[in-house]
């Protein structure tokens, strides 16, 4: 066990494009999507211990501990590795729930990667991804930590290196349940499947965007506003929308024009997750527990 207190990033992600190519008999959807991380997100402070218990603070409103993805991830790793150890986990929450930028999935992945290191359980990236997939379809991309083209239900990952652009991400004042969008009868589910080279050289789109804009006027309003300034899209099933820029200066200039009551941030895309960089820094003793 690694002693001391450690701090771990739990970064946001964007779906730079998202296409739904079919629906399976079990209700799951076949996708083609491009994930990229952001240098912005939540933060987990974790101290491993010998108690055998997992404590988490602060509690999330309306979410029981047993239903919290951080707790579920810790217990899943504990069971898979048959570890007798415990941990105290503190979450500094920045990312919105129901925003489509991976907040809960990223938290779960950070928990898996951090505790695998702190408990010295020695599970491989493949094993962590397998545990993560049982927690949520997006968790494996966060545990593996590289920008990825995903197919299947999102579990078939291929490393890619899209341009690391600057993004203005806006959070409309609504929370959207992924299930509500994927079960909507008007959702387009038959986009023709294409090879990656074709997808990367044509304008990026999101098949969920049309239905989300029709159901949530606030999303439509914010996206229409962003489109005045730059190419802009929905990420995941929303509610967050984003505009892409070639420089931080350009993104900040548009950010400065937003109303004070609009939640938004500027961040740069990252093809290697900040989580993987932090893990490497701990492993090399570039940074140490305190």
UniProtKB/Swiss-Prot annotation:
Pathways per UniProt: Isoprenoid biosynthesis; isopentenyl diphosphate biosynthesis via DXP pathway; isopentenyl diphosphate from 1-deoxy-D-xylulose 5-phosphate: step 3/6
EC number(s) recorded for this UniProt protein: 2.7.1.148
Keywords: ATP-binding, Isoprene biosynthesis, Kinase, Nucleotide-binding, Transferase
PANTHER family: 4-DIPHOSPHOCYTIDYL-2-C-METHYL-D-ERYTHRITOL KINASE, CHLOROPLASTIC
Function: Catalyzes the phosphorylation of the position 2 hydroxy group of 4-diphosphocytidyl-2C-methyl-D-erythritol.
Stated family: Belongs to the GHMP kinase family. IspE subfamily.
Designated name of the protein: 4-diphosphocytidyl-2-C-methyl-D-erythritol kinase
Originating species: Vibrio cholerae serotype O1 (strain ATCC 39541 / Classical Ogawa 395 / O395)
Gene responsible for this protein: ispE
């Amino acid at each position: 066990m690694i002693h001391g207190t450690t701090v771990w990033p739990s970064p946001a992600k964007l779906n730079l494009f998202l296409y739904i190519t079919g629906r399976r008999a079990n209700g799951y959807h076949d996708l083609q999507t491009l994930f990229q991380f952001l240098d912005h997100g939540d933060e987990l402070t974790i101290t491993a211990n010998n108690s055998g218990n997992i404590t988490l603070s602060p509690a999330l409103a309306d979410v029981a501990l047993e239903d919290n993805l951080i707790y579920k991830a810790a217990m899943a790793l504990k069971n898979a590795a048959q570890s007798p150890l415990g941990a105290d986990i503190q979450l500094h929450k920045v990312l919105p729930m129901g925003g489509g930028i991976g907040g809960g999935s990223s938290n779960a992945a950070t928990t898996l990667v951090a505790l695998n290191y702190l408990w010295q359980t020695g599970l491989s990236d493949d094993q962590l991804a397998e545990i993560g997939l049982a927690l949520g379809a997006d968790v494996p991309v966060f545990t593996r930590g590289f920008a990825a083209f995903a197919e299947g239900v999102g579990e078939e990952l291929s490393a890619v290196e899209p341009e690391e652009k600057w993004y203005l991400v806006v959070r409309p004042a609504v929370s959207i349940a992924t299930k509500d969008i994927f079960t909507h009868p008007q959702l387009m589910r038959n986009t023709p499947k294409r090879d990656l080279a074709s997808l990367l050289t044509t304008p990026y789109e999101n098949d969920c965007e049309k239905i989300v804009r029709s159901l949530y006027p606030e999303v439509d309003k914010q996206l229409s506003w962003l489109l005045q300034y730059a190419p802009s899209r929905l990420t995941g099933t929303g509610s967050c929308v984003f505009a892409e820029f070639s420089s931080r200066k350009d993104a900040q200039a548009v950010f400065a024009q937003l109303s004070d009551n609009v939640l938004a941030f500027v961040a740069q895309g990252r093809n290697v997750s900040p989580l993987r960089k932090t893990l490497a820094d701990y492993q090399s003793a570039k940074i140490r527990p305190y």
